[in-house]
């Protein structure tokens, strides 16, 4: 499935465009210009056109900054899709920083790289918090890995620890986002074809990327859900969220927030995959979010 000729042409044009923009972004980033936050969106918008990605957005993007966007994660394509819509940096696994080319691009987009070991969690939380204190917009993929695109996996609530922070005396704004790859050349992408877009499990990146480059035009639906915060999630869960909640309440509120985000995102993905038809809301998991 797909055209090797199309794949080769797209790869060459993509590399040409990328190597043209890399030195520009490196200079504005080193100089501390505000353009360093905005240039990646222009770069990724062009990349979407080059790669045949038709991005369809629904919902309003929360205007407040700082903000933490929470999204499901299906493929490396998610980065280009989201960054074509909003000026953001990503919270990514540390090993991505060592990937050829993609690691460099992640650094130029001011990504925050985190280790999986729990011993590093406080340092990572402080680093993310410092970025938010500077008014940044960050994206977290709390599934911790990519999925097959047919479902949203449990969220790791530990990644929501930064949501306990306040911004200008108010709880940090959180906005869930759903991403779904729904059509190929105008035809619905069924469950059996979704692995052509989703990258997960033991799939090799070079081979999968080559197949993606050879495909036609992929329609990606991105849904921005209503914003919320940890205080709102705590209140909805029946927790006593006062001015100084205890550790147990904070932990429970973090899990409640993770599940509210996951429920909204999973429902959005399900509706997109169903062609926009209404589907039953996805209830929070009874056992709570994964730690």
Q: Where do the language-model regions lie?
A:
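N-terminal membrane-anchoring alpha-helices
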Residues: 1-56, 284-291
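Catalytic core of membrane glycerolipid acyltransferases/transacylases, capturing the structured
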Residues: 18-26, 30-34, 49-50, 65-119, ...
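Short amphipathic alpha-helix with an adjacent loop that forms part of the alpha/beta core around
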Residues: 59-62, 127-133
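Residue-level preference for the first positions of well-ordered beta-strands
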Residues: 66-68, 137-141, 173
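A cross-family acyltransferase "interaction/gating" segment
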Residues: 102-103, 117, 149-244
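Soluble extracytoplasmic domains of inner/organellar membrane proteins
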Residues: 128-129, 136-138, 142-155
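Cytosolic-facing loops and C-terminal tails of multi-pass membrane proteins
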Residues: 236-247, 255, 260, 266-291
């Amino acid at each position: 499935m797909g055209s090797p000729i199309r794949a080769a042409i797209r790869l060459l044009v993509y590399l040409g465009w990328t190597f043209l923009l890399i030195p520009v972004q490196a200079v504005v980033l080193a100089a501390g210009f505000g353009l360093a936050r905005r240039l990646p969106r222009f770069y990724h918008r062009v990349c979407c056109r080059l790669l045949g990605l038709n991005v369809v957005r629904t919902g309003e993007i929360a205007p407040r900054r700082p903000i933490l966007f929470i999204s499901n994660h299906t493929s490396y394509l998610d980065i280009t899709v989201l960054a074509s819509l909003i000026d953001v940096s990503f919270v990514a696994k540390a090993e991505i920083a060592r990937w050829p080319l993609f690691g460099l691009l992640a650094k130029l987009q001011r990504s925050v790289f985190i280790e999986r070991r729990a011993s590093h969690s406080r340092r990572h939380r402080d680093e993310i918090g410092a970025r938010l204190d500077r008014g940044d917009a960050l994206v977290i993929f709390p599934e911790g890995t990519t999925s097959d695109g047919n479902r949203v996996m449990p969220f790791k609530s530990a990644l929501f620890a930064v949501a306990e922070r306040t911004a200008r005396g108010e709880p940090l704004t959180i906005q869930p986002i759903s991403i779904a790859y729904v059509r190929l050349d105008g035809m619905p992408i069924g469950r059996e074809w979704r692995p052509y877009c989703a990258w997960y499990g033991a799939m090799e990146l070079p081979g999968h990327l080559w197949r993606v480059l050879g495909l036609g035009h992929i329609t990606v639906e991105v849904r921005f859900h209503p914003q919320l915060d940890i205080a709102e999630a705590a209140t909805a869960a029946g927790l006593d969220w006062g001015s100084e909640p205890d550790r147990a309440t904070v932990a429970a509120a973090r899990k409640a927030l993770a599940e509210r985000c996951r429920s909204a995102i999973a429902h959005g993905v399900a509706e997109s995959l169903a062609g926009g038809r209404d589907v039953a809301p996805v209830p929070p998991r009874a056992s709570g979010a994964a730690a």
